[in-house]
Amino acid sequence: SKVENIVDELKTLTL
């Protein structure tokens, strides 16, 4: 994933 979407991906992982 890109740095601009890392926050979104982290949120999806920490459901």
From Swiss-Prot:
Q: What induces it?
A: Expression shows a diurnal pattern of oscillation across the 24-hour light-dark, with increased levels during the dark period (at protein level).
CC annotations in GO = chloroplast; ribonucleoprotein complex; ribosome
The intrachain disulfides are none
Can you tell which superkingdom this protein's organism belongs to?
Answer: Eukaryota
Q: Where in the cell is it found?
A: Plastid; Plastid, Chloroplast
UniProt entry keywords in alphabetical sequence: Chloroplast, Plastid, Ribonucleoprotein, Ribosomal protein
Q: Which family does it belong to?
A: Belongs to the bacterial ribosomal protein bL12 family.
What exactly does this protein do?
Answer: Forms part of the ribosomal stalk which helps the ribosome interact with GTP-bound translation factors. Is thus essential for accurate translation.
Q: What is this protein called?
A: Large ribosomal subunit protein bL12c
What organism does the record attribute this protein to? Chattonella marina var. antiqua (Red tide flagellate)
